[in-house]
From Swiss-Prot:
One of its GO terms (molecular function) is heme binding. Its cofactor is heme c. Its main location: membrane. It holds the Pfam family Cytochrom_C550. This is Photosystem II extrinsic protein V. It is a peripheral membrane protein. Belongs to the cytochrome c family. PsbV subfamily. One of the extrinsic, lumenal subunits of photosystem II (PSII). PSII is a light-driven water plastoquinone oxidoreductase, using light energy to abstract electrons from H(2)O, generating a proton gradient subsequently used for ATP formation. The extrinsic proteins stabilize the structure of photosystem II oxygen-evolving complex (OEC), the ion environment of oxygen evolution and protect the OEC against heat-induced inactivation. Low-potential cytochrome c that plays a role in the OEC of PSII.
């Protein structure tokens, strides 16, 4: 009886996992995953990169940026408009990677690596130590896909939840 119960639970979990992954893949078609690489080029994020970005964002970034908001400064979120108005613009993959490597204030004038987790400050923020270039690319891609999936809920704060 115990083996039967374990088998049933395993089959249910396997079916549920397969269904969830299929649903995620269906929502994230090529159009949703097409993102600006920089000011001139676009790229299509793979499902694998999206999944990797989601995992790394959840593990490293979500303690301050859950749902695309910024807990320490709610005026500066990860929504597309806010990212586009930053200087330099952070509404593309290369811009976000640059920020994760060397963060600056919203106007771009002051370096803030000792206050914001980054690759440059990995000695202060150990969660950044093991992130590779591929991880940064995936995180940036995840950040840029989320507004297409969640709309104004991403970075919109309490009012949109």
């Amino acid at each position: 009886m115990k083996k039967f119960f374990i088998s049933v639970v395993f089959i249910v979990l396997l079916t549920f996992t397969t269904f969830i992954n299929s649903a995620t893949a269906a929502k994230l078609d090529d159009n949703v995953r097409t993102l600006p690489l920089n000011e001139d080029k676009e790229v299509v994020l793979t499902i694998k990169e999206y999944t990797q970005g989601k995992r790394e964002f959840t593990n490293v970034c979500s303690q301050c940026h859950v749902g695309g908001i910024t807990k320490t400064n709610p005026d500066v979120s990860l929504d597309p408009e806010t990212l586009a108005l930053a200087y330099p613009a952070r509404d593309n993959i290369e811009g976000l990677i640059d920020y994760m490597q060397n963060p600056t204030t919203y106007d771009g004038f002051i370096e803030i690596s000792e206050f914001h987790p980054s690759i440059k400050s990995a000695d202060i923020y150990p969660e950044m130590r093991n992130l590779t270039e591929d991880d940064l690319y995936a995180i940036a891609g995840y950040i840029l896909v989320q507004p297409k999936v969640l709309g104004k809920q991403w970075g919109g704060g309490k009012i949109f939840r």
